Amino acid sequence: MKSGIHPDYVETTVLCGCGASFTTRSTKKSGNITVEVCSQCHPFYTGKQKILDSGGRVARFEKRYGKRSK
């Protein structure tokens, strides 16, 4: 690597909105990163994920106008 052109790579504490924190390394100068969700509180990782019905609009259209026959 070329010397003098790369930012310092320091230990950084990541603070989550749920209160969890962990240490990693980053080039951010303040040494602290604040995030809204982490792996301890994100619904995908905690198993509290909601399944959304994405077919609602299509079903409503088919109900109004009927299915298209080929």
UniProtKB/Swiss-Prot annotation:
GO terms for molecular function: metal ion binding; rRNA binding; structural constituent of ribosome. The keyword Lipid biosynthesis does not apply. Binds 1 zinc ion per subunit. InterPro entries: Ribosomal_bL28/bL31-like_sf, Ribosomal_bL31, Ribosomal_bL31_A, Ribosomal_bL31_sf. Its cofactor is Zn(2+). Signal peptide: none annotated. Zn(2+) binds at C16, C18, C38, C41. GO terms for cellular component: ribonucleoprotein complex; ribosome. One of its GO terms (biological process) is translation. Keywords: Metal-binding, Ribonucleoprotein, Ribosomal protein, RNA-binding, rRNA-binding, Zinc. Transmembrane segments: none annotated. Belongs to the bacterial ribosomal protein bL31 family. Type A subfamily. Binds the 23S rRNA. Part of the 50S ribosomal subunit. This is Large ribosomal subunit protein bL31. It comes from Mycolicibacterium gilvum (strain PYR-GCK).
